[in-house]
Amino acid sequence: MLERSLIGRESEPTTHEVEKGAIRRFAEAIGDPNPLALDEAAARAAGFSGLVAPPTFAFTLGWSERFRHSLDLGTRSVLHGEQSFEYARPIVAGDRLTVRSKVADVLERAGASGPMDVLVIEDEGRGEKGDLVFKVRSTFILRRG
């Protein structure tokens, strides 16, 4: 059982240089045909300084391996339950973003195969000047046992 005392625990900040190759590969992997994520000329023609990341790209920047390990989740099965995104502006190739993750909530739910834990993580990404770029709220379901 996850302890509610985890609520409020924050990760160390991690800084990411957003690369155009990462944006392009992500767009291709999810089948996003948006030329702003695939074609630099199209992105520049639309007024951006580089490729524009698809909306769900921010998830790849948060919830670091080190933070997951610090929560001591063990080897339980983890199911991605829900996700929401808020953007102050698009993520663009060349951005240098600092991301922090925080445990927003820990809940217990009854499942068909027994009790399970629900873990809610909030990621926040900020630009080099400290400006908010995005927030991601993710819900994970963890089977016990």
Q: Model-flagged regions — what are they?
A:
Residues 1-2, 90-145:
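HotDog/MaoC-like acyl-thioester-processing domains
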Residues 44-45, 53, 80, 87, ...:
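Short, surface-exposed, polar/charged, turn-prone segments marking secondary-structure boundaries
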Residues 58, 65-66, 86, 92, ...:
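A short acidic, glycine/proline-enriched capping/turn motif at secondary-structure boundaries
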Residues 71-95, 99:
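Mid-chain, well-packed structural core segment of small domains
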Residues 17, 84-86, 139-141:
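Generic structural detector for well-ordered beta-strands
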Residues 1-82:
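Hot-dog-fold acyl-thioester-processing enzymes
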